[in-house]
């Protein structure tokens, strides 16, 4: 098989209804395909959003909350509901699922990064399907990874995946917004992610999620630089996961760097925290604090 170890990422809108509640039908479509790929011998990881969206209704919120504490409480409820659906569906096919909640600190700290990678390796060797989400209940805003597109790319690089698939309700990458620009052309293959590609990606995603095409391009950069090819394709098609695994998906494919960064360089490039101090003399201090400019 071309791609044995695959990381799939599904966004909030791909597994919820328009009112933000979980769609069992959409989740069943995803788990059905995962089960088929698992039987075919693939090693699979699923990075799934949706905890906040699944939980806020159960707590009585009429719409997705904006306050941090409200979102964290919603995630605490919703993560359990989310895993309940995935576990029930996969166990009916005899597949063990494992919940892993990660935060930026798990990548920034080298020992925790190595421990997480080790646990994932064992789960894959034992034929389990890890289901990963950011630990929204305890992550503070300034220390969050921020979106699961980035998280999935970091996980794909960590475990040296053969493919990262970003599933979305946004139909691939175009040269412009196809909803407003009839001349927009879909990009089937991207050899190199440059400023023009980033500019094409535009802005935000759906009302229930945190990502958009721009976050997917940034995620594709992390994965491709680490030697992992990336597909961005629609989650609305019934066999989208299987098609991506066979390199037959109708989406945008990002070619990886020929020689991907090794684990140590990945950690230094993308995850380690930069720290330092800048010392200035009295003249520079005066210019910065009193005159508001650098000298």
Swiss-Prot record:
Keywords: Amino-acid biosynthesis, ATP-binding, Cytoplasm, Kinase, Nucleotide-binding, Proline biosynthesis, Transferase. GO terms for cellular component: cytosol. This is Glutamate 5-kinase. Belongs to the glutamate 5-kinase family. It comes from Neisseria gonorrhoeae (strain NCCP11945). The keyword ATP-binding applies. Catalyzes the transfer of a phosphate group to glutamate to form L-glutamate 5-phosphate. It catalyses: L-glutamate + ATP = L-glutamyl 5-phosphate + ADP. PROSITE patterns: GLUTAMATE_5_KINASE. Substrate binds at residues 49, 136, 148. It is found in: Cytoplasm. ATP binds at residues 9, 168-169, 210-216.
